[in-house]
Amino acid sequence: MAARQTLRVLCLAGFRQSERGFREKTGALRKTLRGRAELVCLSGPHPVPEAAAPEGSCPDSGPCSPEEQPRGWWFSEEEADVFSALEESTVCRGLQEALETVARALDTLGPFDGLLGFSQGAALAAYVCALGQAGDPRFPLPRFIILVSGFCPRGLKEPILQSPMSLPSLHVFGDTDRVIPSQESMQLASRFLGAVTLTHSGGHFIPAAASQRQAYLKFLDQFAE
């Protein structure tokens, strides 16, 4: 019997998450998937001002190290470094730099079997795969995608996510998520053919308790042979 393949997954952080902080936030999931998947974390290219960052993002009053600097993938206002997933916007300022960051990671850190995104990172992961499905050579389609607290990105000039996505997908979201309400994640899931959903009773985080473990493993095991 052939040894089980360890899947490599590029994980895109949420808005206002540092690379180190995102690694810590995915620690429970990393433990759950030990031996099944290697998670490679990536944060956005744009520093988020300290005034807009969560309290306690940096360990002291000095400047953040690159790994501790809260970052984002794009901003939803032209003049301010802020982001709202729920407000209608005509702006995705910094999105091209975000796409370049992901393309560079795929090229230099890959190959990867799948993509995982959390919150704003989930919206970006879905957009990246839509671009890949449309033929963008920077983004070869992965074998699967996992979207946690995802949403359809607003402000895109092209309605690329209107086309059904044929990529195998797992959509994870909380019933009491106040940052990204569950209906936003369900709307994103509806853009994927044969989408698998995993719901939990909590809020805005990546669940990895024993009750969710089997759902992750069942989804990933189909790609491990």
From Swiss-Prot:
Cellular component GO terms held in the UniProt record: cytoplasm; nucleus
Keyword Hydrolase attached: yes
Family annotation (InterPro entries): AB_hydrolase_fold, FSH-like_dom, LovG
Active site residues of this protein: 119, 177, 204
Keyword terms of this UniProt record: Hydrolase, Serine esterase
Tissue expression summary: Strongly expressed in kidney and liver. Moderately expressed in brain, skin and testis. Weakly expressed in heart, lung, small intestine, spleen, stomach and thymus.
Molecular function per GO: hydrolase activity
Catalytic activity: a carboxylic ester + H2O = an alcohol + a carboxylate + H(+)
E.C. numbers: 3.1.1.1
Any one of the GO BP annotations: response to retinoic acid
Family in the record: Belongs to the LovG family.
Entry function: Exhibits ester hydrolase activity with a strong preference for long-chain alkyl ester substrates and high selectivity against a variety of short, branched, and substituted esters. Is able to hydrolyze ester bonds within a wide range of p-nitrophenyl derivatives (C2-C14) in vitro, with a strong preference toward substrates of >8 carbons.
Protein name: Esterase OVCA2
UniProt source species: Mus musculus (Mouse)
Gene this chain is encoded by: Ovca2
